[in-house]
Amino acid sequence: MSHNTFGHLFRVTTWGESHGAALGCVIDGCPPGIIFTLAEIQAYLDKRRPGQSKYTTQRQEQDQVELLSGAITQEDGTTFVTTGTPISLLIRNTDQRSQDYGKIAHQYRPGHADYTYDVKYGIRDFRGGGRASARETAARVAAGALARKVVPHLVVRGAVIAIGPHHINRDRWDWSEVENNPFFTADAEMVQIFSDYIRKIRKDGTSVGAVIEIVAENVPAGLGAPIYAKLDQDIASLLMSINAVKGVEIGDGFAAARLRGEENADEMRMGNDGKPLFLSNHAGGILGGISSGQPIIARFAVKPTSSILTPRRSIDVDGHDVDVITKGRHDPCVGIRAVPVGEAMVACALADHYLRHRGQVG
């Protein structure tokens, strides 16, 4: 199985399976001299970590990150500085229950990667889905924590804007609310609505999807390149690589198709500070594949979790019709924990393009 690496100069390889001994990542190309602490990485992992609320999977993983290489400890014993060599980060699995998956060892879960993995490789890891499990994304979040430090002053934030049919009101958007609720939403009035809905979904033995918005600020103008190295192309690619993601849009995205040309164009004037000023941001901070200096805005849609208690029709490995019920501990809405993963993917794309831009034009 190849294709476990992404990036050009800031290259990340993830490894490990949902029910293996551990998982982790190797970051190749991180510049020397980046100062960080494991606590900084841990903060993002804790945001993604399972078992933190009744609205996510009850699998209990501490997700404690371990640094194996690529940085030197400073005198205080907690601060590290990168050396420019490959950085290896490890996260141990401690709460696997592979016995929960015994029955589906010979069945294909509808909507999951079971069938396609089997068709392609002739073998699959049925224990929690192996590499197809959202557990793999913990390694991405760890890499994203360091990626944020590559681009000076970069701020990448995400929020859930919809769960199932329930959408936030953008007039009530408040970033300070995101860390104060289990749904990572910026609309405080939607917390109870989301809560009631997820409780019903879980009671019904099923799952639901979500839409997440990622905003990157302080992105310098000029990142990306025309045609085959567009910044939005790479952001979309990395967001699409996240488990269960089925759609991505940049800026107004599909809504732009309903606008007239004069409505969609981001007009410009010179600001009082002598710098170009955009009067809108329909493009989501990227024009012609190159960052404009405006905030980069991306959204992605996460489908309902495939592993549910509701019986579904499928087949087994011998070609017999079966009804599948998936036991185990699963997210009723995996989109909730996808917020820090989306942030990490955007941060990694920006770090990679920042280094490529610096290497090309200085």
From Swiss-Prot:
Keywords: Amino-acid biosynthesis, Aromatic amino acid biosynthesis, FAD, Flavoprotein, FMN, Lyase, NADP. The keyword Protein transport does not apply. Pathway: Metabolic intermediate biosynthesis; chorismate biosynthesis; chorismate from D-erythrose 4-phosphate and phosphoenolpyruvate: step 7/7. It catalyses: 5-O-(1-carboxyvinyl)-3-phosphoshikimate = chorismate + phosphate. GO terms for biological process: amino acid biosynthetic process; aromatic amino acid family biosynthetic process; chorismate biosynthetic process. Its cofactor is FMNH2. InterPro entries: Chorismate_synth, Chorismate_synth_AroC_sf, Chorismate_synthase_CS. NADP(+) binds at residue 48. Reduced FMN (FMNH(2)). Its EC number is 4.2.3.5. CDD domains: Chorismate_synthase (cd07304). It comes from the Bacteria. FMN binds at residues 131-133, 243-244, 288, 303-307, 329. GO terms for cellular component: cytosol. The keyword Transmembrane does not apply. PROSITE patterns: CHORISMATE_SYNTHASE_1, CHORISMATE_SYNTHASE_2, CHORISMATE_SYNTHASE_3. One of its GO terms (molecular function) is FMN binding. It is an enzyme of class 4 (lyase). Belongs to the chorismate synthase family. Homotetramer. This reaction introduces a second double bond into the aromatic ring system. This is Chorismate synthase. It comes from Bartonella tribocorum (strain CIP 105476 / IBS 506).
